[in-house]
């Protein structure tokens, strides 16, 4: 009986408890200037926002992190708006291409939205061949619909025959529309499998897939790292392996095409460094022992 009464009291009090603002998580309407006490939080995860910087005579100093070097006032600093509702924090940029990010306030995820913003600006390249193919498919679809409609009105057909014509028409239109969709330019934010990642992504991939061949420039048996200039020159050997990388939403994967197939999946925004080459060697040693 006491348990039932306690549950009833909790059920009645739950709305009251939930309505009480928790320290640091009370509602924050959309604003360009978050409270001063929250600057450290926002400037950690939205470090390029203008409210994190004091600019004077073209030179900007970080308001929160004193050890941060001075920077010149340029497009690195963006106008931002932030908001918080319950445990969801969000911020977005008022730039030519708006970038919006939502995260948990208590367990936030670091997101370098400025780099992502710059990538979107750079990726706006029109694929002429895909556009031509798409336009031809659309013209063919419209012409086919017009022709069938004109011929259909002249024919005296039974209901079953008409149904078959309609079904065939829908199947054909479905195939054409699928072809159109599949040939639209794909967003490079989520590229599928590729042998060579974009130049701008090399630093990411070569940090976590450091043995992949696309990270190295080899000449006369000597290889130099493309990304990290302080990396020593190495001899071209089986340390460098052929790799394929892919990304789908926030899942990044790379696989080594060696004597055995080896792949590693990770979260793109919070990647985990894995010495997959050592693991690969371990697999090879175990196989040789058998």
UniProtKB/Swiss-Prot annotation:
Main subcellular location of this protein, as a coarse class: host cell
InterPro entries in UniProt: ASFV_fam_110
Residues passing through the membrane, by range: 1-19, 128-148, 163-183
Any one cellular-component term (Gene Ontology): membrane
Entry keywords, A to Z: Glycoprotein, Host membrane, Membrane, Transmembrane, Transmembrane helix
Entry keyword annotation includes Magnesium: no
Localization: Host membrane
Pfam families: v110 (PF01639)
Protein topology in the membrane: Multi-pass membrane protein
Residues carrying covalently attached carbohydrate according to the record: 242, 267
Stated family: Belongs to the asfivirus MGF 110 family.
Job of this protein: Plays a role in virus cell tropism, and may be required for efficient virus replication in macrophages.
Protein known as: Protein MGF 110-9L
